[in-house]
C-alpha cells in the first residue's frame, strides 16, 4: 500500500503539469531534452515505437477497448476521436492524471469514452469483457506486475488483443541509471522490470501471434489471447 501511495503522489504532481505531455510525446523543448538525455531517442524514434504499440487497434474498430493506465490521455484521445463506434473504457490509479484525460476527451467531444479510477491488479470487470486491452507506459510503474498480467488476461475476450509498450531494462545503461536513481525514487517506476527476452518468453507463454520489438529501452508488443 505504501508503494501505491507513493505512485499516486508522484503522478498527482505530473497530472497537474503540462511537462508530462511534452515529454511523453517528445514535442516540446523540455520534452525533447528528456527524450534525448534519458531515453536516447529523438521524436521520430519516439513516434515509431508508439505507432507500433498502437498498431494492435484496427482501423474502424467498433468493439470494446480498455486502456490501463490512461495517464493524461495525450497519446490516445486523438486516436479515439477516429473510433466513434468503439466502446472505450479508460482506467487509472491516479485521479489527477485521469482528470487531465477527461478534459481532453471533453475538448474533443468524445461521447464513447468512459473513465474509472481503479487498480490494474484488481480490475472491476467480468471475465472476457474486452476485445482489446491497451497499456502504454504502464507496466514499469505497476507495483504488482504479476497481478496486472493476470488481470489483463482475465478481462480480455478469447481472440482479443493485448498491445502496448513499456520500459525494459538492460538495453541502455544511461536509461537504466535514470530509472534506478531518479524515476524509482520519485515514485514513477517500480521494480522488478522486464528484459526483452523475459518479456518475449512471458508473452509467448500467455498469448498467440506475438509481435514484439524494442527501440532502445522501450519494448512494444501486439499479441492475442487464444480462442
Q: Where are the model-predicted features located?
A:
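Conserved class I S-adenosyl-L-methionine
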Residues: 1-59, 78, 180
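Class I SAM-dependent methyltransferase SAM/SAH-binding core
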Residues: 64-122
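Short glycine-centered segments of the SAM/dcSAM-binding site in methyltransferase folds
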Residues: 64, 159-161
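A short acidic, Gly/Pro-enriched loop at the edge of an enzyme's catalytic core
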Residues: 121-132
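A short SAM/SAH-binding and catalytic strip from SAM-dependent methyltransferases
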Residues: 132-144
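A short glycine-rich, Lys/Arg-flanked "PGG" loop and its adjoining helix->strand segment in the class I
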Residues: 146-158
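C-terminal alpha-helical "lid/dimerization" subdomain adjacent to the S-adenosyl-L-methionine
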Residues: 14, 23, 37-39, 43, ...
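C-terminal lobe and adjacent flexible extensions of AdoMet/dcAdoMet transferase-like proteins
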Residues: 221-227
Amino acid at each position: 500500500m505504501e508503494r501505491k501511495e507513493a505512485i499516486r503522489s508522484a503522478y498527482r504532481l505530473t497530472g497537474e503539469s503540462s511537462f508530462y505531455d511534452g515529454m511523453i510525446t517528445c514535442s516540446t523543448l523540455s520534452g525533447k531534452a528528456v527524450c534525448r538525455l534519458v531515453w536516447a531517442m529523438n521524436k521520430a524514434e519516439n513516434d515509431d515505437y508508439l505507432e507500433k504499440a498502437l498498431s494492435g487497434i484496427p482501423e474502424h474498430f467498433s468493439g470494446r477497448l480498455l486502456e490501463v493506465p490512461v495517464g493524461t490521455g495525450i497519446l490516445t484521445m486523438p486516436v479515439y476521436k477516429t473510433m466513434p463506434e468503439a466502446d472505450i473504457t479508460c482506467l487509472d490509479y491516479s485521479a489527477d492524471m485521469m482528470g487531465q484525460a477527461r478534459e481532453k476527451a471533453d475538448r474533443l467531444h468524445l461521447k464513447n469514452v468512459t473513465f474509472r479510477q481503479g487498480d490494474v491488479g484488481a480490475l472491476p470487470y467480468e471475465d472476457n469483457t474486452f476485445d482489446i486491452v491497451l497499456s502504454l507506459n504502464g507496466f514499469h510503474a505497476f507495483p504488482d506486475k504479476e497481478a496486472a498480467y493476470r488481470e489483463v488476461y482475465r478481462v480480455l475476450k478469447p481472440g482479443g488483443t493485448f498491445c502496448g509498450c513499456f520500459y525494459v531494462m538492460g538495453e541502455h545503461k544511461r536509461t537504466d541509471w535514470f530509472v534506478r536513481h531518479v524515476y524509482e525514487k520519485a515514485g514513477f517506476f517500480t521494480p522488478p522490470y522486464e528484459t526483452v527476452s523475459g518479456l518475449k518468453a512471458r508473452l509467448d507463454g500467455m498469448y498467440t501471434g506475438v509481435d514484439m520489438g524494442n527501440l532502445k529501452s522501450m519494448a512494444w508488443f501486439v499479441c492475442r489471447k487464444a480462442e
